[in-house]
């Protein structure tokens, strides 16, 4: 049983590591990263170390990266697991908060790619306007009167169609 467990764990580890390396490169627009089993030769007892080298920086463990670099690296790892074993839904709670606009753009492009390739639905909690603009549908909670919350939903694809239909160019055509 342990032999089978070790074999499956190593196989999954190698697949996740391969995806992680590729996704890190895409999310950072360069650099390199890998996963390492540490503290034991037995994969069932080993720890995991995340090593990363964002563009222009030396290879170091996750804890030594900046907050934004940590968030993007962790996102690459999460997405690597999803590519290895896709789930139908994933909730991401403000993972874009420490990211600058260029990284938010790459993050959103990666979400779209994963949705298209795995079929996973991502529920993204965010305050970042750029992330909201790249989503298909937005849900918001408002408080019209004290103590009474209401849910607002906007389908951005339909909203774009309405704007295009009402544009002056469309009226002249």
From Swiss-Prot:
Listed CDD domains: ABC_SMC_barmotin
Any Pfam family matching the protein: SMC_N
Disulfide bridge partners, by residue number: none
SUPFAM superfamilies on file: P-loop containing nucleoside triphosphate hydrolases
Source superkingdom: Bacteria
Protein known as: Uncharacterized protein in ATPase CF(0) subunits 3'region
Origin species: Rhodospirillum rubrum
């Amino acid at each position: 049983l342990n032999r089978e467990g070790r074999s499956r764990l190593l196989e999954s580890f190698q697949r996740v590591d391969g995806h992680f390396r590729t996704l890190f490169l895409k999310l950072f627009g360069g650099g390199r990263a890998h996963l390492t089993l540490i503290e034991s030769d037995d994969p069932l007892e080993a720890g995991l170390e995340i090593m990363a080298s964002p563009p222009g920086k030396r290879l170091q463990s996750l804890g030594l990266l900046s907050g934004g670099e940590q968030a993007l690296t962790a996102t690459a790892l999460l997405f690597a697991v999803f590519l290895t074993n896709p789930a139908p839904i994933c909730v991401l709670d403000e993972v874009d908060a420490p990211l600058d606009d260029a990284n938010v753009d790459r993050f959103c492009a990666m979400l779209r790619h994963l949705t298209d390739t795995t079929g996973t639905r991502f529920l993204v909690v965010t305050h970042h306007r750029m992330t909201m603009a790249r989503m298909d549908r937005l849900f918001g909670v408002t408080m019209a009167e004290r103590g009474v919350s209401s849910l607002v939903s906007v389908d951005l694809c339909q909203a774009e169609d309405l704007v295009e239909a009402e544009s002056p160019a469309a009226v002249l055509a």
